Regions:
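Classical Sec-dependent N-terminal signal peptides that target proteins to the secretory pathway
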Residues: 1-5
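Catalytic centers of hydrolytic enzymes
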Residues: 16-29, 196-213, 218, 288-545
Length: 545
C-alpha cells in the first residue's frame, strides 16, 4: 500500500472528504468483483469518519468504465449487450461503495466519460446515464454544438459541467466548506471514435493521438476549465478544486501548470500507476483493468482552509479469491454471466511450452502467435466469399486482450473470447477490401513499421495474415548497421507457391484492412489517406469473420 499526499502544518481537522477513485476499468467485468470486495474489506480506512455530518464520501470514476458497449455475444443473457452487463456491474459497484460508506451517510458517485465510453456512440451513453445513480460531469463539452448533452444538462440534475458540494464544519454550523468537482474528457474524438459522436462535440476535438497534442491544441479546454475554477474561487477562495481528467498525465500536467488553483487531479487514460506533485497540484494516476484503486482523504482546518490531501493505493488482486467465496456477490455474477464463465478454450502443450500453439505454414513471424493465428483464421473465412484476397491486416491495438496460458490459467471462457477484439469498438471494427499496387502496399507496410519503431505504444503495428515483416531488420537498416534493403525485410506469400517473396511493385494485390485505420488521419500516418478511395466497405466486421 503506497501513501502520498500534501500536508500543511495545521493539526486540527474540522471537515473531511473521502474519495475512492478508479479509472480505465475497460468493461473488465471479471475483475470488478475483486474491486468491490476490496472496497468492502477496507471500508474503515477508505471512508474514515464516514458517519460524521462534517464528512462527505465520494466514489469517483475518471473515465473508460465501459468498452465496446454495443457488442453482443453473451450466453447467459444473449439479449444484453456489453454495455448492458457493464452497466449492471457499475451500479453494483456504486452500491457497494455506498453501503461501505454507510447507507445513511452522505455519499455521491461521480463520473466523467473516457474515449472508450463512447465506443457505442454518444446517444447510447447519455441514455444510460440520464437516470443513473451517479453524477456525470462534462466540463469540456461544447454545449453549443452538443444538443443531446445540452438538453440532458438542462433537464437532469445528475448531469452537468461541474458539481459543487457543501461540507459543514464540525463545530460551527454557519461555516460551510466547498468542494468543486470537474470532469475533462480527452477531446480527440475524431481520432478515437471517428463518426460515432453524432450530437456531441468536445472543445479542441481533433484527429490527433494525445501523444501529439500540444498546448496550442488544447487552448479551449484549458480556457473552459480555468473559467469554471475562477468563478468558483471568486466566491469560495478557500474551496477545494478536484478534476477528474481522462486525458493522460501529459494533459493533466498541463492543466495543473496553467490552472494552479486545482488541488487534485484524478488522472486516467494513459494507464499509469504513479503519483506526481505538479506545483501545488497532486496528480494521481490509476492504471487499468481494476488492478488497484485509491483511497483519498481531503481535510479542512478550523479556518476552512485545505489542511491535508492523503492518498493510498489499494491493490485488488488479492481479494479475487475472497470475492469468489462471497455468496451474495457470486449470485449477482451468476445472474449476469454464469454461462459465460464455463471454459470453452483449452491450451494444449504440444511442444513443452504451455503457451505455444502448434504452428503451420499460416504462421509468418513469431512476433505475436495469437495475432498470426487469428489473422489467418480471418483470411480463411473471408476467402470463402472473397477468394481474391491476398492478405488481411489488423492493427495490433485491436487485440487488446489475448489468451495467455500460465500457472494460474490454461482454460478460457466466452468473456475472454469476447474481449479479444476489445481494442476497437463494434462500430469501427468494420472492414474494407481494396485493390492496390505493390508499390502502394510496400509503402503502407513500411510506413506502419517505421511509425511503430518511433513509438511502440502509440503507433500500433499492423498484424498481417500473409505478409512477413522483419521489424528488427528495418531497425538495423535505419541505424545503418545492415547492407540489406527494406525490400528484404517485407515479403508477401505467393498464392501459388505458398512461399514468401518480395512484394512486386508492378503487381496488384487485394487487401482487407480495418475501417478505423483507413479512416484515421494523423500527422504520422500518411499512406492510408492516399489509397483510401481504392477500398470498399463490406458488410462484415472482425467479430463476424
Amino acid at each position: 500500500m503506497q501513501v502520498s499526499g500534501i500536508k500543511n502544518n495545521i493539526s486540527f481537522k474540522s471537515a473531511q472528504l473521502n474519495i475512492v477513485s478508479t479509472a480505465d476499468n475497460h468493461g473488465d467485468i471479471l475483475s470488478m468483483p475483486q474491486m468491490m470486495k476490496a472496497i468492502q474489506m477496507n471500508k474503515r480506512d477508505l471512508f474514515e469518519k464516514a458517519s460524521e455530518k462534517s464528512t462527505l464520501n465520494l466514489f469517483a470514476i475518471a473515465g473508460d468504465f465501459f468498452m465496446n458497449p454495443s457488442k453482443k455475444g453473451f450466453l447467459t443473457n444473449p439479449e444484453f449487450s456489453n454495455g448492458d452487463i457493464q452497466y449492471n456491474f457499475l451500479t453494483k459497484m456504486v452500491y457497494t461503495a455506498k453501503t461501505a460508506a454507510g447507507i445513511k451517510n452522505r455519499f455521491d458517485a461521480v463520473y466523467t466519460p473516457g474515449n472508450h465510453c463512447f465506443d457505442g456512440g454518444d446517444e447510447w451513453l447519455f441514455k444510460k446515464f440520464e437516470r443513473a445513480p451517479i453524477s456525470t460531469i462534462l466540463t469540456n463539452i461544447d454545449r453549443t454544438h452538443s444538443p443531446l448533452a445540452d438538453t440532458l444538462i438542462r433537464e437532469n440534475s445528475n448531469i452537468g459541467t461541474y458539481k459543487v458540494y457543501d461540507i459543514p464544519d464540525s463545530k460551527n454550523p454557519d461555516k460551510i466548506n466547498k468542494v468543486m468537482v470537474l470532469g475533462v474528457t480527452i477531446p480527440s474524438m475524431n481520432y478515437y471514435n471517428p463518426g460515432l459522436l453524432k450530437k456531441t462535440k468536445f472543445y479542441d476535438n481533433s484527429n490527433k493521438n494525445d501523444a501529439y497534442l500540444e498546448e496550442r491544441d488544447l487552448r479551449k479546454t484549458v480556457r473552459v476549465v480555468r473559467y469554471n475554477v475562477s468563478k468558483f474561487k471568486e466566491k469560495n477562495p478557500d474551496g477545494v478544486v478536484i478534476v477528474m481528467a481522462h486525458t493522460g498525465n501529459k494533459i493533466s500536467g498541463l492543466l495543473a501548470e496553467k490552472i494552479p488553483e486545482i488541488n487534485l487531479i484524478i488522472n486516467g487514460h494513459d494507464h499509469k500507476e504513479f503519483e506526481v506533485l505538479k506545483g501545488s497540484t497532486l496528480i494521481l494516476s490509476h492504471g487499468q483493468g481494476n488492478k488497484f484503486m485509491r483511497g483519498i482523504q481531503i481535510k479542512f482546518d478550523d479556518k476552512g482552509k485545505l489542511s491535508e490531501i492523503r492518498a493510498r493505493k489499494y491493490e485488488t488482486e488479492k481479494y479475487e479469491p475472497i470475492a469468489r467465496k462471497d455468496a451474495r456477490l457470486q449470485e449477482f455474477v451468476n445472474v449476469n454471466i454464469k454461462a459465460d464463465l464455463v471454459p470453452l478454450v483449452y491450451f494444449k502443450d504440444n511442444s513443452g511450452k504451455a503457451e505455444e500453439l502448434v504452428l503451420d505454414d499460416s504462421i509468418r513471424y513469431s512476433n505475436n502467435i495469437l495475432a498470426n493465428y487469428i489473422t489467418s483464421a480471418i483470411k480463411r473465412s473471408v476467402r470463402l466469399k472473397y477468394p481474391e484476397i491476398d492478405a488481411v491486416g489488423i492493427p495490433s491495438t485491436i487485440f487488446r486482450n489475448g489468451l495467455k496460458s500460465n500457472e494460474k490459467r490454461s482454460t478460457f471462457n466466452n468473456i475472454d473470447l469476447m474481449k479479444m477484439f476489445d481494442g476497437v469498438s463494434e462500430n469501427l471494427s468494420q472492414v474494407r477490401i481494396g485493390r492496390i499496387n505493390g508499390a502502394e502496399l510496400f509503402e503502407l507496410v513500411l510506413e506502419n513499421v517505421q511509425n511503430n519503431l518511433k513509438s511502440r505504444t502509440r503507433n500500433a503495428l499492423i498484424q498481417w495474415s500473409d505478409i512477413q515483416i522483419n521489424r528488427s531488420l528495418v531497425k538495423e537498416i535505419n541505424k545503418g548497421n545492415s547492407a540489406a534493403s527494406y525490400k528484404d525485410a517485407i515479403k508477401i506469400r505467393d498464392k501459388a507457391t505458398r512461399k514468401f517473396a518480395p512484394i512486386d511493385p508492378n503487381k496488384d494485390y487485394t487487401i482487407l484492412m480495418s475501417d478505423k485505420y483507413l479512416l484515421k488521419d494523423s500527422e504520422n500516418i500518411k499512406i492510408p489517406a492516399m489509397i483510401r478511395d481504392k477500398f470498399e466497405v463490406i458488410p462484415e466486421s472482425y467479430d463476424s469473420l
